[in-house]
Amino acid sequence: MVETSIDMEEGTLEIGMEYRTVSGVAGPLVILDKVKGPKYQEIVNIRLGDGSTRRGQVLEVDGEKAVVQVFEGTSGIDNKFTTVQFTGEVLKTPVSLDMLGRIFNGSGKPIDNGPPILPEAYLDISGSSINPSERTYPEEMIQTGISTIDVMNSIARGQKIPLFSAAGLPHNEIAAQICRQAGLVKRLEKTENLIQEDHGEDNFAIVFAAMGVNMETAQFFKRDFEENGSMERVTLFLNLANDPTIERIITPRIALTTAEYLAYECGKHVLVILTDMSSYADALREVSAAREEVPGRRGYPGYMYTDLATIYERAGRIEGRKGSITQIPILTMPNDDITHPTPDLTGYITEGQIYIDRQLHNRQIYPPINVLPSLSRLMKSAIGEGMTRKDHSDVSNQLYANYAIGKDVQAMKAVVGEEALSSEDLLYLEFLDKFERKFVMQGAYDTRNIFQSLDLAWTLLRIFPRELLHRIPAKTLDQFYSRDSTS
């Protein structure tokens, strides 16, 4: 075996040197002693006594001691026959435009029985540093085909906005629907309702990463993408529940590295969907516990906020590059608790949230998106004349106001009875019912473009006389209020 050495500022790193100095195993971690010049995040090759090999990454360095996390698990590793080789490289993933339409495991290896990927580059999964001054503000809308998102929580290209869900709710179905229907919306002219819907063969792509999902869920996504023709623009990464927990730490980073290549080198507008970030946070907690770190809230590590930011902040747009990365991470809140550390910290980092509601789901309303706690902080830069339609913002505000009042009236009705309500209150109750049954409720394969959704919103707002539509300017009412709802 050839040994090479690289002089470093603090010692010498031995490339190719094999060590048999395993001093301990703790969960997914292996502790080594008497290592010359180990580097933080360096990749190591581990050979077991039976000849099988595994990969790991240096998590911690203390003098000649190194703590390595093993991606494939530590079962079978001992201190007598196991050898560890330090490569001198950080973890890189091969990337190529040919990755579109392919399925990979959580480590980035093809699992669709297709040919190996011919890489056009090898990129560090931690991503490249982006000069903050080179970032451009997210603008223009990504259309999901779902009315409650497109009209009331519009997503800008380059935005990061999570779906807050819980166990038993249809977040997987919503994610698959977004993958089927998502596309770019671009106004070609000022002529009303004239748009270009680019569904992505050329410059729109989706990177989908599933972490800790069961086999049934994985098969659902694969089957849905293949049967509905969206697979050709999707790169799918699957980390199953029976895969090593530690693999969940690298799966979103490999997915985002692929997205960065497609966006910034190939000029594509990439939508990244990450599910389930709660599984990622649990994997982070497991590694932290194995390292015997001081736990933070509910046992999660104190640095989880920073760690989540290294994932979410990779969304955005860069000056001089055509592409963009938009992120929709999906979280399942334990016990429907929005104050749980994972959704709580996610909400601080991201630019809004889309809330999936159990009460709506129990009433057979799909998608059960509750618009009141939902928010898109960058919506204003994605809508309006020249991007969607000039009445978009006013219609959204009026829908929010009327729905909130309708909810208050519904609560009051439960106390005083319907007989005590005014005629105006009854209008809000009528709006509340029709809003949930016609606007929120939408078939899983029912695609509405933004103009169809806006026209449907006007149909609902015409329940009220003009005098009650306080949030819409008179000029906009003159143009849209009396118009035929089918126009």
Curated annotation (Swiss-Prot):
PROSITE patterns: ATPASE_ALPHA_BETA
GO biological process, one term: actin filament bundle assembly
Record GO terms (molecular function): actin filament binding; ATP binding; proton-transporting ATPase activity, rotational mechanism
Domain of life according to the entry: Eukaryota
Record-level GO cellular component terms: cytosol; Golgi apparatus; nucleus; plant-type vacuole; proton-transporting V-type ATPase, V1 domain; vacuolar membrane; vacuole
Principal subcellular localisation of the protein: membrane
Keywords from the named record: Hydrogen ion transport, Ion transport, Membrane, Transport, Vacuole
Membrane topology: Peripheral membrane protein
Keyword Membrane: yes
Signal peptide segment: none
Compartments, as annotated in UniProt: Vacuole membrane
Pfam family, one: ATP-synt_ab
InterPro entries, sorted: ATP-synt_VA_C, ATPase_a/bsu_AS, ATPase_F1/V1/A1_a/bsu_N, ATPase_F1/V1/A1_a/bsu_nucl-bd, ATPase_V1-cplx_bsu, P-loop_NTPase, V-ATPase_su_B/beta
Function: Non-catalytic subunit of the peripheral V1 complex of vacuolar ATPase. V-ATPase is responsible for acidifying a variety of intracellular compartments in eukaryotic cells.
Subunit and partners: V-ATPase is a heteromultimeric enzyme composed of a peripheral catalytic V1 complex (components A to H) attached to an integral membrane V0 proton pore complex (components: a, c, c'', d and e).
Family per similarity comment: Belongs to the ATPase alpha/beta chains family.
Protein name, per record: V-type proton ATPase subunit B3
Organism of this sequence: Arabidopsis thaliana
Organismal lineage: Eukaryota, Viridiplantae, Streptophyta, Embryophyta, Tracheophyta
